């Protein structure tokens, strides 16, 4: 039984109550009694609204299911379908043109285009690494990944390989020629760097040149009479620091003495309480809240053991430079932090209230996330003995990403929640900013209205292909069998969805005011492919896009030097490339022309992916990790990838493409493979051969067989219940 404390009509888990009173409230000038009474009133007032919104989701889905079932043998009529969605209030009138009015937003959001990390907040080491990923070594990122091929003697090996190192240096020089070109010649031929009369001078043998754009030299860092120094350059609002040390092992091999090129990388980072974490009870939630508090105070630390050495990882300090005219320049040493709360669906046992029937019920998790992440973030707005040495926002804002909202009424509810939380926390109205995840179909179709509902709070919109595809499948579950998962990326609605997000954001005045983001690169080991392909996102007008690691952030940062996103947005402003009918194009299989082996391949791929993710989620509480696919390619998996895989199989099951026996047989084939892929993990519990004794195996099976009945196809209800079951059995 969870130990609880009564706070008014709230029954608060002791672990949460003590954390709030002893750790989070000190330094905020908020009276504990006033705080808890305020929380109780917010919960009491907003719970009915939250439930009403969920009821609306279910009612709309039931009407859509019925419409499709009555027309399953008829050709799809987009005109009739569009009118039906209008009639039931799913597709709403588009509001008149407007411009967002959000104020007090940091430059990282309004002015700087660059990568965005997403990291599970429950893992302190990951969180620290991500916060510190504002700056990253290009040399390390190139040397340690497949961006540099292991051919022509350039293998990584266990010792430093000079052949590979030379290729890294050559690659970096070519990049510098693109981002900060010289007035004449190339960085490749440079033999020295110096500063003369406030200008950067680059020696090319006996000759000398400067930068093609001298204003890109913005600073340097040099100790008196030291050969170890650095040059700070800027391009498209991003910084490049060239480290020079002729005595270093790498610098000795370089004609200029350059030992590394440091790129400003993860400009912003989302600390995630949602899809990448397993927070199923009060203990889990408090672990996340405590890490978030430590990030805002600047005192989060973690003991790390690397190469047999133990050290304490801390948050990086800001970086100081001398400007060309002798002034001082300070740049942030850390990524600007967002926090992603959960959506409107889930509840948490961290706080219980009277359900009205004599039974206690859990409160909506999204409500308490707003309260407690907002409370912790107050410490990131100021420094002091009780607030820590570092700040997050320099403009007094707290940035909260709100996922899985369906339509403008749900966005408006989030804004009302934030306003009420500001009152409880004694914050000025508008302090809590919102990032809108455009990852549900009803939000996509009504995006302009969604943005208008948060016009004075919104700081980003972001597309999320995987969750959005999961909702696409579930919304039209009764329409017929869907195309295969791999074909979804080429479907009509996807391109319309990506284009519409950018165009509507720009029309609402996002340029220079808010982020327009795009989705995650999931193939964590395939960085060469990422470098080749992910440049398409800034080319599409996105000011940020998600990356899975600090290394990926550094490599993706190159794209924002190669593409002037502001210029792209200027060109796109005023366009409306997608139509509603394109967005309404359901990705149905035209005919069931798949061979039996193709069906089996899809089912096996999806079952393996589901098992590989769910077994770590349920058994070990790992919500985001590199999961090998059926071909042993490491993919970054979270609940969004699980949603699409489980929903596709549920759809095929619903329409007779496969049977429940096919699902079970595939799961039993794939479980031994997943067991083998995890054989090196001492904490891993095999699922085979006693499948029905494995809670994780049963969870994976349930996600597929019951997928059509899950609210909007979400995986949280089953995952949370199964994880709690596992924890109860293994206390």
Curated annotation (Swiss-Prot):
Pathway annotation: Carbohydrate metabolism; glyoxylate cycle; (S)-malate from isocitrate: step 2/2
Cofactor: Mg(2+)
NCBIfam families reported in the protein's UniProt record: malate_syn_G, PRK02999.1
Top-level class of the enzyme under EC nomenclature: transferase
InterPro entries hit by this protein: Malate_synth_C_sf (IPR044856), Malate_synth_sf (IPR011076), Malate_synthase_TIM (IPR001465), Malate_synthG (IPR006253), MS_C (IPR048355), MS_N (IPR048356), MS_N_TIM-barrel_dom (IPR046363), MSG_insertion (IPR048357)
Cysteine sulfenic acid (-SOH): modified positions: 624
Active-site residues (renumbered): 340, 638
Function: Involved in the glycolate utilization. Catalyzes the condensation and subsequent hydrolysis of acetyl-coenzyme A (acetyl-CoA) and glyoxylate to form malate and CoA.
Binding site for Mg(2+): 439, 467
Keywords recorded for this protein, A-Z: Cytoplasm, Glyoxylate bypass, Magnesium, Metal-binding, Oxidation, Transferase, Tricarboxylic acid cycle
The keyword Cytoplasm belongs to this UniProt entry's keyword annotation: yes
Gene3D superfamilies cross-referenced by the UniProt entry: Malate synthase, domain 3 (3.20.20.360), Malate synthase, domain III (1.20.1220.12)
One GO CC annotation: cytosol
Protein family (similarity comment): Belongs to the malate synthase family. GlcB subfamily.
Protein name: Malate synthase G
Listed EC numbers: 2.3.3.9
